[in-house]
Amino acid sequence: PDFVIPRVGSATTYYQKAVFRHLERMGVLFINGSDAIDNVKDKLYTMQILSQNNVPHPKTMLVKNPIDSDYVQRNIGFPIVVKSLSGTHGKGVYLAENKRNFEQLVEMMEQFNERFNIILQEFVKDSHGKDLRIIVVGGKVIGAMKRESTDGDFRANVTRGGGAKPVELDEQMEYLALESTKLLGLDIGGVDLLYDNDGYKICEVNSSPGFNGMEKYTEIRVAEQIVTYVKNKLN
């Protein structure tokens, strides 16, 4: 092939990654490359890269079972967001409202795997059920929208039934979207921002963002922008 646009994101398997790397070494153009996919497949590694470069994000902690809930309370506090190491569309993401709720969630996880690892993240209260999704293609922001839950869920994903509307970018939003995708090596990226009185924080970055919602609510032709970018890269 002349080019490949991987659309598997965090679900990328070892076999798929091996094929990608083989084709890359044959000179095939990849949008995004295998290293960039690795950078965002692991949510903790994404946060480590952003933290190293002083990019604002919610306070984040990796823990393994058994978990000291008192330590969690002292260092992050409750409510707290509980995440699997990988995943998209809001899957594997839970909100523990208090210490007891968190301990019950841990007990449930123990039924499936007693030696699990999870990511714990600061809950940004002002952004409950709301976030900003920004699409970056080739180092340029091509669209942004505000997503909002319609059923009281703390997650705002359109794929989970949430609504959305276009939003005008400000300087900080644009900087965070461009800086994060640049640091992670992404040609195409979906950047999710949370916000409060202190400003914006990067919640997650996706290497294979869905764009049906962006096209529906903003009328921006994301697929067309991607095709134009690929054509320019090939030429």
Language-model features: where?
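Conserved N-proximal alpha/beta basic substrate-recognition cap immediately N-terminal to
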Residues: 1-59
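Short glycine-rich anion-binding loops that position phosphate/pyrophosphate groups of nucleotides
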Residues: 9-11, 86-87, 208
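Structural detector of well-ordered beta-strand residues that form the stable sheet scaffold
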Residues: 30-31, 58, 81, 119-121, ...
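ATP-grasp fold ATP-binding core
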Residues: 50-51, 73-91, 114-127
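Rossmann-like NAD(P)H-binding beta-loop-alpha module
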Residues: 56-77
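Protein kinase-like catalytic core scaffold
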Residues: 80, 142-143, 189, 201-203
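Phosphate-binding site of ATP-dependent enzymes
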Residues: 91-184
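C-terminal active-site "lid" helix and adjoining low-complexity regulatory extension at the edge
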Residues: 168, 172, 182, 195-235
